């Protein structure tokens, strides 16, 4: 087996200027500035084992675990839309296991079992602070945000959990050195859970659950 640990830090600065030469578009010129800090940490672990007690039996096992921590902070300023602070975080992980078993009953009958189990968890987090409220008045109204705050501090959280098992059984009956019969039986069991939440931080530090006015609140 092996283990891998990696870490990276990236800083990005970008300045843009947009000028619209056709006044009939009625679109104002825009200057934007953005500063982005990205952090990423990754851990990877793989272990494998093989067991052969005799010439008729063989067992192979492998497990691969992966854990990631990601964080991105962006400070964005627009001469048209104002200032926005955005923070994105995620700590996804996955565990993948493989099991293979081979059994030779005799010269004419061979069995093989293969199974794979995967667990995956994802939890993306997004937070945006919109300092110039007037530029987002229509959007805030549609989302049902509380307008009496100093700014719009909104959060979206998601939770995605996946659990899947794949397994199959193979049987070979040897008829001759050049021909055989093969029968395969397999199954896939899969389950996924999804949850999402959207809310607003108020100036007092409390949490407000808005009711959107679009799509009848859904």
List each language-model region with its residue ranges:
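Primarily recognizes Gram-negative and organellar outer-membrane beta-barrels
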Residues: 1-218
